[in-house]
Design a protein with these regions (language model features):
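N-terminal Sec-pathway targeting helices
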Residues: 2-16
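Extracytoplasmic soluble-region selector
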Residues: 4-7, 32-203
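Intrinsically disordered and other compositionally biased segments
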Residues: 12-14, 28, 42, 57, ...
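Hydrophobic single-pass membrane-insertion segments
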Residues: 23-35
Length: 469
């Protein structure tokens, strides 16, 4: 009996010890980490109402207990805009609300702008400067008029101030020097008036076919910014196609960042027949493509896709040696106000991408045609993509970023498939196709573009393909 008692006591002690360990572990698990917020985020502005005259500026001070960046917005930026540092710039008579937001809390200030009858005015030669490291610095030009007299900015003793010196600096004579990729404002003041110049600093300003090829040859960078300054004709120029379009998704091998076409057209590209998996950008991830037209883009291999072989919303984290790990990060693509005129030698093609992993497309027009005038085949040719692979197991927060809004695909000869040939992992369930319109005549295409697209960006001439303005 003594032995049994001993065993029972030992077991009881073990249970007590185990309970203590579990209790200790539970305490450790619920202990707040350094990242767990202990105080409620607050923000307050030093004024709740303010009045300005046209061309005046005023800086609102915000106080917050958060270390996050404060986001400033104006409800009516045409009346008064606000910089990233809270500086309000009055533009025209009216009323607006300036809001400062940090996290999920905000505070606001009502701003009234009244008309200024003073005769002094500042006229700027350019209200936006687009710069890159290669383009170098640029001087702000303009005049100051006061009654019947008119002076240059220098003659009027204009002063200059940058809103963010880490993006661009400005000297006493108004010379703006790019420092890093990003956006900022420069304030130009003279005779009691202030005007603003928007400064956009890019990774590269793309002006020629050679520039375009150089852009495609750069390692992918989510922070990259590109701007097209001219129409670019690839006649007699070999296109630098990206060919790493399968397997793991590495930023270094993908097209990333933002590309603003400035309403310009890339034309007359003919792919070398030796290039397989032909597309304009190869693999796109974390890419914003906007305001650009592609005309007479000739694909010479089967399986071609207009914009990209893969449009993705995730990529593999690379290790120190540049090799892919199994960790995935979220980086969706957004395609807006894009025109594509794509010519194919073979069937088995896609209008936009070979495989669509998600992302957003809006106000996109694609004209698909065969080079020999033969018909497109609804069984083998697809309006958007042959495959859809939007993962049902992905983070639910990813789903709202998947949409097709106002995508118009024209196939005058034959027809193209408006759905996916293959879906994986519940794909297609998170993407509605009601925003995709497949048509067979220019009249139908023109009607849809005129009624659905932004008329400030697009123009429609009866009997012709829609055009970006």
């Amino acid at each position: 009996m003594a032995k049994k008692t001993k065993i029972i006591l030992i077991c009881a002690a073990a249970l007590i010890l185990a309970a203590a360990i579990v209790t200790t572990l539970c305490l450790v698990l619920v202990k707040p980490s350094e990242e767990t917020p202990t105080d409620k985020t607050t923000i307050s502005l030093n004024v709740n109402a303010y009045a300005l005259t046209e061309d005046e500026t005023f800086t609102i001070a915000a106080t917050t207990n958060s270390t996050d960046v404060i986001k400033w917005t104006s409800s009516s930026p045409e009346v008064a805009s606000v910089s990233s540092q809270g500086r309000v710039i009055a533009k025209t008579a009216g009323e607006t609300t300036i809001t400062a937001t940090v996290g999920n809390v905000s505070d606001s200030c009502r701003v009234q702008v009244v008309a200024d009858n003073a005769q002094a005015t500042i006229k700027l030669a350019q209200t936006t400067l687009r710069l890159s490291a290669a383009s170098g610095a640029m001087q702000i030009q303009g005049t100051v008029a006061d009654g019947d007299s008119q002076q240059t900015l220098t003659e009027a003793g204009a002063t200059y101030e940058t809103d963010n010196a880490s993006v661009a600096t400005v000297s006493a004579d108004g010379t703006v020097t790019p420092m890093s990729v990003g956006s900022t404002l420069v304030f130009v003041s003279a005779n009691g008036r202030t005007k603003t110049v928007a400064v956009e600093v890019y990774t590269m300003l793309v002006s020629t076919a050679e520039d375009w090829n150089a852009m495609l040859g750069l390692p992918g960078d989510l922070a990259a910014r590109f701007y097209v300054t001219n129409d670019i004709d690839f006649t007699d120029v070999v296109y630098n196609a990206k060919v790493n379009n399968g397997g793991d998704v590495l930023l270094s091998q993908s097209f990333c960042g933002s590309l603003d076409g400035g309403g310009h057209t890339i034309s007359n590209v003919t792919f070398d027949g030796s290039v397989s998996s032909q597309s304009l950008f190869g693999t796109m991830v974390g890419c914003t493509l906007t305001n650009i037209a592609f005309s007479n883009i000739h694909f010479t291999a089967s399986g071609a896709a207009g914009l990209a072989i893969r449009v993705l919303q995730h990529y593999n984290v690379a290790d120190k040696n540049g090799n892919a790990t199994r960790e995935l990060l979220f980086a969706p693509c957004y395609v807006t106000n894009v025109f594509g005129d794509f010519v194919y030698d073979y069937n088995g093609v896609s209008g936009i991408t070979g495989i669509y992993y998600g992302g957003g497309m809006e106000n996109v027009f694609v004209n698909m045609r065969m080079s020999d005038g033969s018909a497109l085949n609804k069984t083998t040719d697809f309006a958007v993509a042959k495959q859809s692979m939007v993962w049902s197991m992905a983070d639910p927060n990813w789903f709202p970023n998947n949409y097709l809004n106002n995508v118009v695909v024209l196939a005058e000869s034959g027809a193209v498939n408006a759905a996916w040939d293959t879906t994986y992992d519940g794909a297609g369930l998170t993407i509605g196709l009601s925003g995709l319109h497949c048509v067979t005549t220019k009249m139908e295409a023109g009607y849809l573009v005129r009624t659905l697209f932004d008329n400030n960006m697009w123009t429609v001439t009866p009997g012709q393909l829609p055009e970006l303005r």
